[in-house]
Amino acid sequence: MNAGPSWNKVQHSKNSSGKRQSKSQVPHASSQPRSSLTAVTQPTEEKLKESISPEARRKRNPLGSRCQGASGNKLFLDFQSMKIIKENADEDSASDLSDSERIPIPPSPLTPPDLNLRAEEIDPVYFDLHPGQGHTKPEYYYPNFLPSPFSSWDLRDMALLLNAENKTEAVPRVGGLLGKYIDRLIQLEWLQVQTVQCEKAKGGKARPPTAPGTSGALKSPGRSKLIASALSKPLPHQEGASKSGPSRKKAFHHEEIHPSHYAFETSPRPIDVLGGTRFCSQRQTLEMRTEEKKKKSSKSTKLQRWDLSGSGSSSKVETSGHIRVPKQAAVILDSADSCKASKTQAHAHPRKKGKAESCGHATVSSEKKLKTNGVKQNTYKLK
């Protein structure tokens, strides 16, 4: 309703004088909104007052008077409080009253509860500032809550008699609810005795010294013992290397004495040797190569010896008796063991498989040659 006449004026100016006049009159119309608003609101208020009948006014008067009285009181209180706040905003009041006490505030509907508390009994001994001058400060005491015949009983001694010494007859019994109450107090006394003993045992225990190599952050003694034992023991790889060393030396001496018999004799613990370091494996390959070279040289020398012994006289053969026959059996057994060992080594080291197979073929050929030599010797005996 308020914007109606202003828009009508703008439209009329557009129709009469064109676009330029409308642009010039728009700010003029917007500069006078208050006059148009007042002109519109005055006749509307008069019309509303005339439309309301006098009977309705009579009905609304008593309710309106009450509301006006309540709202008037609230407004008066609010005005008074705001006045006091404005007066004391810049100046600090010297009174001890708070703002809620100085400013009148309507009472709240919630009333505080009435607490009927008994007065505290204050013992002047506990507030004595100089206890050393006069009488000594006594220990704090609790009032006796048990009746007169039972208040003199020592519940701690009764708990020790029942649980530690198992003397149930020495402890008096009481029936009813009071007896159950006393039994429960005795149980609590026994629990207190147990806790005191446990705490004393914990404090008396000395901490075990940790290993020098380990850090001091280890808390449990079991861990420190395990680590100390692990440090004292050597590693399994070191054990295998230390044990395989003398066994290799022994095998090497045997190969020097009987090179064809112990061509591929391994150490008693091949798993430890295989689990060793790379240095041990390289050393083993070098030893294998030297053994192969020695084996080839020993084959040629041994064949020459067998030929010389075969061309010898029959008397020498008969006097010798067994002509290295048991040694031939030992050769067969040792060669079989060496083949097994070579197979295990070939499975463990697939890269060295070709070398192991070639060595195995060489031992088989040496066995055949030895067998043929043995047959020649047997035929020589029969002749």
UniProtKB/Swiss-Prot annotation:
Coiled coil: none
Biased composition (Polar residues): 8-43, 374-383
Membrane-spanning residues: none
Region named Disordered: 1-70, 89-115, 200-222, 232-251, 284-325, 338-383
GO CC aspect terms: cytosol; nucleoplasm
Source species, domain of life: Eukaryota
Compositionally biased tracts (Basic and acidic residues): 44-56
Effect annotated for changing S95G: In a breast cancer sample; somatic mutation
Annotated family: Belongs to the FAM217 family.
Protein name: Protein FAM217B
Gene expressing this chain: FAM217B
